[in-house]
């Protein structure tokens, strides 16, 4: 298949720049790919799509304030680092601007020298491996000096950084939020649990590759980014029990889907506790092994995320649903509305 097969017209004014006042007041487009039906609803009605005995699987990663502004120790030139992933100890892969000024051995100071970074390796596309030195606890230093890394298509400043975190965010490590989860409130989750739905959490630390456009025409040539994931034994056991009892595994967002399907592919359809790195690329032709239904936001044209949704529900039907969403003025991307896919 070709990348252009997943293109669609999206008016720029439909790209949501700010979150709604209430998390669960966003719109929800409910689609059933077998019946070929679409229903316009609101997100707090997602509870009606869940049955007692189902499992609702959420990604509990927490977004790091991963954007750092500092200056080179020798020239005092301004430098921006965006933390991508912790490679080992105090070493991180980062995206550096301007990268050409940062050679191996260069040092950068942040916050009056409370945090220092030394460049230890150069990667392509402005990537660098840096080693940090600091006093105290790294995450606390980062909280005091770093800024929330909003996606490139959001141009307005976020007044409350917690609105770019899910209410169940727990495990530090992401460069971007698992945005399908932003719609849930604590109260809505309590109601869902009271209905007899199992709430299950996994972790996938979202990298910036999630925003990287597909740069090749032939999908078979696309090099998918890697992200760290983890599923506990307790969570795996709950999911096995749900499947055995005839319940559904309902994933919240593409990051939960990619984690569950990575594990399902690795263990021949079985659900086992596991952790590691995944670069799974789910596109039409893929056979789903674990996930029975899911919620997700509306994604960028020609993105791997539109391809993932198309793998589950069929490209033509998904693009028809997207055209409907555009016609009905749904809000798109990270702070936008949601879709529930049966």
UniProtKB/Swiss-Prot annotation:
Protein name: S-adenosylmethionine:tRNA ribosyltransferase-isomerase
Keywords annotated in UniProt: Cytoplasm, Queuosine biosynthesis, S-adenosyl-L-methionine, Transferase
The keyword Heme is annotated on this UniProt entry: no
HAMAP family: QueA
Subunit record text: Monomer.
MF (Gene Ontology): S-adenosylmethionine:tRNA ribosyltransferase-isomerase activity
Catalytic activity as recorded in UniProt: 7-aminomethyl-7-carbaguanosine(34) in tRNA + S-adenosyl-L-methionine = epoxyqueuosine(34) in tRNA + adenine + L-methionine + 2 H(+)
Stated family: Belongs to the QueA family.
Gene3D superfamilies, A to Z: QueA-like
Biological pathway: tRNA modification; tRNA-queuosine biosynthesis
Function: Transfers and isomerizes the ribose moiety from AdoMet to the 7-aminomethyl group of 7-deazaguanine (preQ1-tRNA) to give epoxyqueuosine (oQ-tRNA).
Entry-linked Pfam families: Queuosine_synth
Source organism of this protein record: Streptococcus pyogenes serotype M49 (strain NZ131)
UniProt keyword annotation of GTP-binding present: no
Gene Ontology annotations for the cellular component aspect, listed alphabetically: cytoplasm
Main localization category: cytoplasm
EC number: 2.4.99.17
GO biological process: queuosine biosynthetic process; tRNA wobble guanine modification
Lineage per the UniProt record: Bacteria, Bacillati, Bacillota, Bacilli, Lactobacillales
Cell location: Cytoplasm
């Amino acid at each position: 298949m070709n990348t252009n097969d997943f293109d669609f017209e999206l008016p720029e004014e439909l790209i949501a720049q700010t979150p709604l006042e209430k998390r669960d007041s966003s719109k929800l487009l409910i689609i059933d790919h077998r019946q070929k039906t679409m229903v316009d609803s609101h997100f707090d009605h997602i509870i009606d799509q869940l049955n007692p005995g189902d499992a609702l699987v959420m990604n509990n990663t927490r977004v790091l304030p991963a954007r750092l502004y500092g200056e080179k120790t020798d020239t005092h030139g301004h430098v921006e680092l965006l933390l991508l992933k912790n490679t080992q100890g105090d070493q991180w892969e980062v995206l550096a601007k301007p990268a050409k000024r940062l050679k191996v051995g260069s040092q950068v100071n942040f916050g009056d020298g409370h945090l220092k970074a030394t460049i230890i390796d150069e990667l392509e596309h402005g990537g660098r491996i840096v080693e940090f030195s600091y006093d105290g606890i790294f995450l606390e230093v980062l909280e005091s000096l770093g800024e929330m890394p909003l996606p490139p298509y959001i141009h307005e400043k976020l007044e409350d950084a917690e609105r770019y975190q899910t209410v169940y965010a727990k495990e530090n490590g992401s460069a971007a939020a698992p945005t399908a989860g932003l719609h849930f409130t604590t109260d809505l989750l309590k109601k869902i649990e009271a209905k007899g739905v199992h709430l299950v959490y996994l972790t996938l630390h979202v990298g910036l590759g999630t925003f990287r456009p597909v740069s090749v025409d032939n999908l078979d040539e696309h090099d998918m980014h890697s992200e760290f994931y983890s599923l506990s034994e307790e969570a795996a056991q709950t999911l096995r029990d749900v499947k055995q009892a005839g319940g559904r595994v309902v994933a919240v967002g593409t990051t939960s889907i990619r984690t569950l399907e990575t594990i399902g592919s690795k263990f021949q359809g079985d659900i086992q506790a596991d952790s590691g790195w995944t670069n799974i690329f789910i596109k039409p032709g893929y056979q789903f092994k674990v996930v029975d239904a899911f919620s997700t936001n509306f994604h960028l044209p020609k993105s791997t995320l539109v391809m993932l949704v198309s793998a589950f529900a069929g490209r033509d039907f998904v693009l028809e649903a997207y055209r409907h969403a555009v016609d009905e003025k749904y809000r798109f991307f990270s702070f936008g509305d949601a879709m529930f896919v049966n």
